[in-house]
């Protein structure tokens, strides 16, 4: 059973004994799964609708207490909620980080004997966890702790390592990867082999072979 995600708004202005509860739901996005995926929002639970796949986690509220922002970590998005009407007003995808670009270097292995910060042909999923809102000069800014997370439970797991993927050797520009000349070398533990990845993305043509990491 995969219950629908929702956000409850509890009003205790009249006292805890007279509390009222309203619920913001995501059911209006059911049937829009492909459109949401095209926008970069991850929906990938087995057989799950959008509302079932969304997993609200941390919440922050604007300075004027009219808007809540909720992290949807596994979905790589933030939901904006109008507090007065208890309505989800928009979904904000956070996108991906291309670690092959200058300025996006990272140390991808803990099995290479030291610190080695460099570019690699992988895309990072931001996946926000805790979240905060700040409003200097009347403009609201959202700050997120992009922790990353994978789903791994009985009956379904997206978690794997680069060494376990069937990579398409024609999809990678080895001329641009210093010291790596083949898929086999790329998948060595001192390179990307031990790097944790999701199996739900990267197989762009659904043939079981991964063109992207």
Locations of the language-model features?
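Beta-sheet-rich non-transmembrane sensory/scaffold domains
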Residues: 1-213
